[in-house]
């Protein structure tokens, strides 16, 4: 620590590094915990802040993103913050129009339909320069966190971004995106390469701006079986990690732990554990003991309580957390949900989840 209390990048010195130590595989006094979508609509203060402007205008406001990121930290003793943003800012920066339709979700008025539509996309190298507002939000949030907990940056993985860009929004089948994989494999690889080339400088830029860890969301992994996943998703997941780490080294920046969360990607756990990430996130369909057997001690695991468990009583939440922590064990583990928090969840039950993780994980270490 420097004499003025600032860290090497001029940010306040980190006071709680439990999350980072667990991510790197070091011993911790208790199990760290954070929640995907912890900055979300289940919080009344979030709804109030968001009511002032539309979704992507909020994403482009560093002040609003900072405020939304900090809100859950004021309520709960979480061990990490994750910047408020959206994975679809990357397709926007590539030149695609994206709107957020209330009650429906993201919509692309002009999705990619033909191979020649790829010509509409901007050079991926300009993406980071288009997303300065995300970097500003990260820097502002890092300052205002005042070293309380680490700040996580994130992005969507190439396949998941491709699904939105081709489907034109969400889909229960991803049939249009998968049609590309079968009918236009070369164009699919071209698009996935464009996205990878856009993501690498974007993620590096987040670290330069102050992010202390990075999570890559492969939210639509489950729409691919092992064969398609290994061909169209895994190579790019690997490449993102490899290139981000190389660029950080070249820039003389300290490495940050990287997390891969491939929802419903249980069939690829072993491959994901060897993809160059320090942490593998799990959804609730994976049994913790089986996951640990599969990946061994090579990576930290993160997850994986069913988000709907938070509809249970606070007492039952405590019991479910105890079982989860017993199954994962105290080493190389970060507690989280198996997916994001839902808008109708009770903040009190989120607090019960966080408190139960801290309480039981301390007891585990005493025994």
Swiss-Prot record:
The keyword Ubl conjugation does not apply. Coproporphyrinogen III binds at residues 37, 39, 41, 86, 164, 219, 339. Changing residue 253 to Q: In FPCT; decrease of activity. It comes from Homo sapiens. GO terms for biological process: heme A biosynthetic process; heme B biosynthetic process; heme biosynthetic process; heme O biosynthetic process; porphyrin-containing compound catabolic process; porphyrin-containing compound metabolic process; protoporphyrinogen IX biosynthetic process. It is linked to Familial porphyria cutanea tarda: A form of porphyria. Porphyrias are inherited defects in the biosynthesis of heme, resulting in the accumulation and increased excretion of porphyrins or porphyrin precursors. They are classified as erythropoietic or hepatic, depending on whether the enzyme deficiency occurs in red blood cells or in the liver. Familial porphyria cutanea tarda is an autosomal dominant disorder characterized by light-sensitive dermatitis, with onset in later life. It is associated with the excretion of large amounts of uroporphyrin in the urine. Hepatoerythropoietic porphyria: A form of porphyria. Porphyrias are inherited defects in the biosynthesis of heme, resulting in the accumulation and increased excretion of porphyrins or porphyrin precursors. They are classified as erythropoietic or hepatic, depending on whether the enzyme deficiency occurs in red blood cells or in the liver. HEP is a cutaneous porphyria that presents in infancy. It is characterized biochemically by excessive excretion of acetate-substituted porphyrins and accumulation of protoporphyrin in erythrocytes. Coproporphyrinogen I binds at residues 37, 39, 41, 50, 86, 164, 219, 339. Changing residue 170 to D: In HEP; relative activity of 17% and 60% of wild-type towards uroporphyrinogen I and III respectively. Pathway: Porphyrin-containing compound metabolism; protoporphyrin-IX biosynthesis; coproporphyrinogen-III from 5-aminolevulinate: step 4/4. It is found in: Cytoplasm, Cytosol. InterPro entries: UROD/MetE-like_sf (IPR038071), Uroporphyrinogen_deCO2ase_HemE (IPR006361), Uroporphyrinogen_deCOase (IPR000257). Optimum pH is 6.8. Changing residue 80 to S: In FPCT; decrease of activity. Belongs to the uroporphyrinogen decarboxylase family. This is Uroporphyrinogen decarboxylase. It is an enzyme of class 4 (lyase). It catalyses: uroporphyrinogen III + 4 H(+) = coproporphyrinogen III + 4 CO2; uroporphyrinogen I + 4 H(+) = coproporphyrinogen I + 4 CO2. The modification N-acetylmethionine is found at residue 1. Its main location: cytoplasm.
């Amino acid at each position: 620590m420097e004499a003025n209390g600032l860290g090497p990048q001029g940010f306040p010195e980190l006071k709680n590094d439990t999350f980072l130590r667990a991510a790197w595989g070091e011993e911790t006094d208790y199990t760290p915990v954070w929640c995907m979508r912890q900055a979300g609509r289940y919080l009344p203060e979030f709804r109030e802040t968001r009511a002032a402007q539309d979704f992507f205008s909020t994403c482009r406001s560093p002040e609003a993103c900072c405020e939304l990121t900090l809100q859950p930290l004021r309520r709960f003793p979480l061990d990490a913050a994750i910047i408020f943003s959206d994975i679809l800012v990357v397709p926007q920066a590539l030149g695609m129009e994206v709107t957020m339709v209330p009650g429906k979700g993201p919509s692309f008025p002009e999705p990619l339909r033909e191979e020649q539509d790829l010509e509409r996309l901007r050079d991926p190298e300009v993406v980071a320069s288009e997303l300065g507002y995300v970097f500003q939000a990260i820097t502002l949030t890092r300052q205002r966190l005042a070293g309380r907990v680490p700040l996580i940056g994130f992005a969507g993985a190439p396949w998941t971004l491709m699904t939105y860009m081709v489907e034109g929004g969400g889909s229960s089948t991803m049939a249009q995106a998968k049609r590309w994989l079968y009918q236009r494999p070369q164009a699919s690889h071209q698009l996935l390469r464009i996205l990878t080339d856009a993501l690498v400088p974007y993620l590096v830029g987040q670290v330069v701006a102050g992010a202390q860890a990075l999570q890559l969301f492969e939210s639509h992994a489950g729409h691919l079986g092992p064969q398609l996943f290994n061909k169209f998703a895994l190579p790019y997941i690997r490449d993102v990690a490899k290139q981000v780490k190389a660029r950080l080294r070249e820039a003389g920046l300290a490495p940050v732990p990287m997390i891969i969360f491939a929802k419903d990607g249980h069939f690829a756990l072993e491959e994901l554990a060897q993809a160059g990430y320090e942490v593998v996130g799990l959804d609730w369909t994976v049994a913790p003991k089986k996951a640990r057997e599969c990946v061994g001690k090579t990576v930290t695991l993160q997850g994986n309580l069913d988000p709907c468990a938070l509809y249970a009583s606070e007492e039952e939440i405590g019991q479910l957390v105890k079982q989860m922590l017993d199954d994962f064990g105290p080493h190389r583990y970060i507690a989280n949900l198996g997916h994001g928090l839902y808008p109708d969840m009770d903040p009190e039950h989120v607090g019960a989840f966080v408190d139960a993780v801290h309480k039981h994980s301390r007891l585990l270490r005493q025994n």
